[in-house]
Amino acid sequence: MITNESIVAEIVTDIPLSADIFRKYGIDFCCGGNISINEAVKNKKVDAETLIDEINELPNHDQGNINVKYLDAPSLIQYIQSRYHETMREEFKNLSPYVTKVAKVHGPNHPFLIQLQDLYRQYRDGMLEHMAQEDEHDFPALIKLSRGEQVDHSSDIIQSLVDDHTQTGQLLEDMRELTSQYQPPSEACQTWRLVYHRLMNLERETHEHVHLENHVLFNKFS
């Protein structure tokens, strides 16, 4: 049962579709998700009762019929890699030329698009480096740890990943603010609108990705 004291991150773990509701009201459920409903609604355009009612109307099942909470660490890592790492690498490759084109064509009259391109590149490059580090070093170390094997500096590994997630979250917030919540101006061309739409999708995917690691995977080692 969800109450005013229920923790946002735990709600999203149990009811993944609730992420859409938290996102709608600008409530962080990944890096800042370890807060209660009461804390989360402060300074937001929703009260706790309304938020709880909306969540309670959702079906209580995982998207894709995979209840990630009950996966062991190796299985969850494999899920994260196939569901997020592979798809995000592909999307970065496909989206980047459009971001460059919009900045080049419209940047002279809309300088914030050049700034958006810079933020996007920081976000993309940081995520690509982060995912490579996870795949090549950190995830294999966590799998060893889950099997009871000795891993040096295991707490440092997790803290470093959490710190990376926090930096990524700030870049996503900066891009959203710069683009007026991804609302294109009336004169925006189709490519401009496409970039905004796909950046919003990447933001959603990244939030879900980070939530799974911060609040499900890493909790298995606490």
Swiss-Prot record:
The keyword Metal-binding applies. GO terms for cellular component: cytoplasm. It is found in: Cytoplasm. GO terms for molecular function: metal ion binding. One of its GO terms (biological process) is response to oxidative stress. Its main location: cytoplasm. Di-iron-containing protein involved in the repair of iron-sulfur clusters damaged by oxidative and nitrosative stress conditions. Belongs to the RIC family. ScdA subfamily. It comes from Staphylococcus haemolyticus (strain JCSC1435). It comes from the Bacteria. InterPro entries: Hemerythrin-like, RIC_family, ScdA, ScdA-like_N_sf. The keyword Amino-acid biosynthesis does not apply. Homodimer. Keywords: Cytoplasm, Iron, Metal-binding, Stress response. It holds the Pfam family Hemerythrin. This is Iron-sulfur cluster repair protein ScdA.
